[in-house]
Amino acid sequence: MMKLRVSEAPFPGAPVMVMIAGLGGLGGYWLAQQSALSRDYQVVVYDQRGTGDNADTLPEGYTLADMAQELHRALLIHGVHRYAVLGHALGGLVGLELALAFPEAVSALVIVNGWLSLSAWTRRCFEARERLLLDSGPAAYIAAQPLFLYPPSWAQENQPRLEAEEALHNAHFQGTENLLRRLWALKNADYRERAARVITPVQIICARDDMLVPWTCSQALHEALPHSRLDVMDFGGHACNVTAPQPFHSLLYAGLASLAPAPHKETV
């Protein structure tokens, strides 16, 4: 069974927020958001299948729909039947799969730096990273990750953090075969024919300076979804929730309030 980390509910009847990381797959990506959201939500984070605490060998042909099915089953086992989703890139697209397959379960969806279909630019970035992984190995692949995730000015000011992250990712690397299969799943996800069927209210957050996924991809996704709002950050890069947490949280809370107002603990 997939392992989930489920926080205590902050008050009786608190809504559930499921956080889904991107290609790296580790729930620790959401550390800053866990702290912020745990005041109003029962928070669920997890390491995706084939990564971290959920080590496994992924099958050939593994898809984002498979990822969504696995997560939904694990949530049901934990007694979670209705939840909001906060997903980054791959995680946001897994959220779309959940909204399409289980519309009665997903109360709201927030997609951070996601897309409707893979852009030529993002495909070029992925293919370059794949070649780096295959030709030079995992250490070189991991060393290059910050180039795609962070604005240069932020990275320059956070060198000790980048070095610590690099050491952590090397120690917990998901494996070349797993990573390639997750990349295959991500590159082949396409919602152009299905987006109009999403009835879940969606907030889309993107960063104008994202070097991996052009912000216009979020704009195209917004235009294709029937019930969505688009919030664009001027700074933050692909990992904008990490590099600019306060502006990100302000947009996130405003969006969540408009999509699905959270019940608050009664005061006497």
UniProtKB/Swiss-Prot annotation:
This enzyme's EC code(s): 3.5.1.-
Gene responsible for this protein: rutD
Keywords: Hydrolase
Family annotation (Pfam families): Abhydrolase_1 (PF00561)
Biological source species: Cronobacter sakazakii (strain ATCC BAA-894) (Enterobacter sakazakii)
GO terms of molecular function: hydrolase activity, acting on carbon-nitrogen (but not peptide) bonds, in linear amides
GO cellular component, one term: membrane
Family to which the UniProt record says this protein belongs: Belongs to the AB hydrolase superfamily. Hydrolase RutD family.
Taxonomic lineage from the root: Bacteria, Pseudomonadati, Pseudomonadota, Gammaproteobacteria, Enterobacterales
HAMAP family: RutD (MF_00832)
Name the record gives this protein: Putative carbamate hydrolase RutD
